[in-house]
Every structure is written in C-alpha cells, then in structure tokens.
Amino acid sequence: MQIFKELWKMEKDDPKRFWNELAMKAMDDIYWFKAWEKVFEWDYPRFSWFKGGKTNIAYNCLDYKVKRFASKPAYIYENPELDLSYSITYSQLFSLVKKFASALRGSGIKRGDRVLLYLPNSIEAAAMILACARIGAI
C-alpha cells in the first residue's frame, strides 16, 4: 500500500514527470519508432499524450514480442463447458495473424475500413482482431 501511496503522490504532484518515468521504465515492453517530445500537452479543448512519439499497437502486440518470446505462450484458451484447453505461442499467433491479415487484404479491406467480427471467444477471434489492427482496419 505504501508504494501505491508514493506513486499516487508523485502522479498528483508532477503528472508529466510521473508518466514520463513510467513510460521510460516500460521501454523494454513497448517499442517506440520515435521517442516523444512532450509527455502531455493540453490545448483546450484538445489534449495529446506522448506528443511527437510514434509507436504501433499491432507491432507491439506481436512483431516486437515474437523476437523475445517466440516459443512462449501468447494466448491460453480455456472452455470448461466443452472441456477444452489449449495455447498458442507467440510465433504461432504471429503466423496466424499474418494469414488473417492477408485474407482481409485479399477481400479488399484496407486501412480505415470498418470490420464487424461475429466470432466466439477464441484464439482465432483474438488473431482476427490483431489482423484488423495490423492492416489499419477499425
């Protein structure tokens, strides 16, 4: 609880420093193509976080992780009703996402297009969501 109180106080007293330090500590887990110039900027009514920085959520979820964790489980699926339990490694998930992304592109879906997925909770559903993010579909 003491650590929480210290972090809360730091965030309250100097939020820009707090978020900058937190982001710097997360550099091993979040790849930035370009580092930010400003942590936070508020020009009412607009505000920006990590202004000038460039990262990519799809890249961070798989491309960056597969380099370090290729054979580690990326997703573990459990369905007690069907008595199913299986997992997929980062390498396997990366391959599946690339196949789904290719299929989406082949169907004419491009950056900015809206995609509706109606799938059961599964590894394939997660892979399809990541594939949409990978090609920039919404």
Enumerate the language-model features and the residues they cover.
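Adenylate-forming
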Residues: 4-10
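Short regulatory alpha-helical segment in sensory/regulatory domains of signaling proteins that mediates
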Residues: 11-12, 105
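A short N-terminal helical cap/helix-turn-helix that marks the beginning
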Residues: 12-34, 53-76
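Acyl-group handling in specialized metabolite and lipid biosynthesis
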Residues: 43-54, 80-88
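Conserved AMP-binding/adenylate-forming core of the ANL superfamily
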Residues: 58, 75-129
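Anion (oxyanion) recognition and catalysis
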Residues: 133
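Structured binding elements
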Residues: 136
